[in-house]
Amino acid sequence: MYLKIVILVTFPLVCFTQDDTPLSKPMAIDYQAEFAWDLYKKLQLGFTQNLAIAPYSLRKIFVCLQQLTVSTNPASAALSEQLKNVLKFNPKGKLPDLVRRRYSSQRAMLERENSFNTTTLAAVIGREKKTNSFWDLPNSCAIFVGSLRPGSPKQMSRRFNAAMRNISKSGMQNFLSTSDIDRDLDFLIADSWIFKGLWSYQFEEQHTTTCNFYTNSTSKGLMRFMYLQEYLKYGYFSEWNVEAVELPLHHGSSFSCMLMMPVKADIGVLIKSLNHRRFKDIYSKMSFSKTDVRLPQFTLRIKFSAKSILQQFGFNAAFNESVFHVFDNKNAVPLGDVIQKVKLVMDHDGEQSAKMYVDRRMGNLFIAHQPFIFVIFEKTQLVPIIVGHMVTASTPKDIGPESDEISCDRPPRYQ
């Protein structure tokens, strides 16, 4: 047995004292949500391809890793300062327990949600005895933990991948490559997110079309477009340069999906304008109306190194300083990396059939044949869980001929 994994069936996520009490008023700024938008906006500047990221999870991981630090370690002060400035979490402020409690509540929602398969595994490389704080991560943070025997990158990645495959119930295959791990690493985290939405309404497969997705006036590619007509939350706001529609998930879900497209200019202008306040404003002003949706059928698979991303924003203490106490009777170590993989599937599957209308031409149109943003969010406080965009066509190998122009809803004509 090369990788010792601690797996608990249930997760009492955070331990609180009896003195922990919620705020009497909601927070003026939702820092959890703002970090999600900030990270997405900064990341997309250098990311010209299709994108999906779970910023929610990256922040949660580092909030949880606070328990592996000790105040007497000088490096802890640098980490705390960067948590406050970059990840917008102040471990010395008045609200750390409230923040952790909120993560606990959201994690419980995710555990009940069958549209998500999410797994986080923290592995320490070495034979030395591990600290109790490290072994407690499953209880305190719902992070699986493992002890990985040193070996070649090929050996270690194979053992690590076997553990990820096991705890994700075969959802995540071949998570690490040999280039993700080396003999010098002491501490590594893998973060896997798979979203395959079970919608409230089934897309009508008989009305699937083959149409062009237009990146710009010179770049396009054929994709299969799904079709749905139903009463949905929809909004068109020229003052905010956005057209939006909500695709609700199945009955009882705590999560939903929002699609947004620019009504003028390009998608970069829309992305730069987004923050949590704007997202809430858009959502609050949307209204239910008969809406036709055409959405590309696609699967995105995106892999990130959190180290390379976060260091660009000034968050480097976790990776450069010996700050995490994972070995007993040994000095602290830096975190090698957090490797995040996101798989997002947009497909037909729905809980119920859409209503049949006599006149199918009436109603709003949301035709996603140009770059658009998608947000998978928690419905109570509108916190983004996964956010990203589709900007280039992903043409299936077995794509058929293009449908006629009317079936493709008269796609955009760029000037």
Swiss-Prot record:
pH dependence of activity: Optimum pH is 8.0.
Gene Ontology CC terms, in alphabetical order: extracellular space
Superkingdom, taxonomy of origin: Eukaryota
Subunit structure and binding partners: (Microbial infection) Interacts with Zika virus envelope protein E and Zika virus-like particles; the interaction does not affect Zika virus replication in human endothelial cells and keratinocytes.
TM region(s), chain numbering: none
Residues modified by glycosylation: N117, N166, N216, N320
Coiled-coil zones: none
Post-translational modification as stated in the protein's UniProt record: The N-terminus is blocked.
GO molecular function, one term: toxin activity
Pfam families associated with the record: Serpin
Gene it is expressed from: SRPN25
Note: Patients with dengue virus or Zika virus infections during the acute or early convalescence phase have higher levels of IgG serum antibodies against the protein.
Leader peptide range in chain numbering: 1-17
Tissues showing expression: Female salivary gland (at protein level). Not detected in female carcass without head and salivary glands. Not detected in male tissues.
Annotated function: Anticoagulant serpin-type protein inhibiting host coagulation factor Xa (F10). Does not inhibit host thrombin (F2) and trypsin.
Keyword line: Blood coagulation cascade inhibiting toxin, Glycoprotein, Hemostasis impairing toxin, Protease inhibitor, Secreted, Serine protease inhibitor, Signal, Toxin
Name recorded for this polypeptide: FXa-directed anticoagulant
Cellular compartment(s): Secreted
Similarity annotation: Belongs to the serpin family.
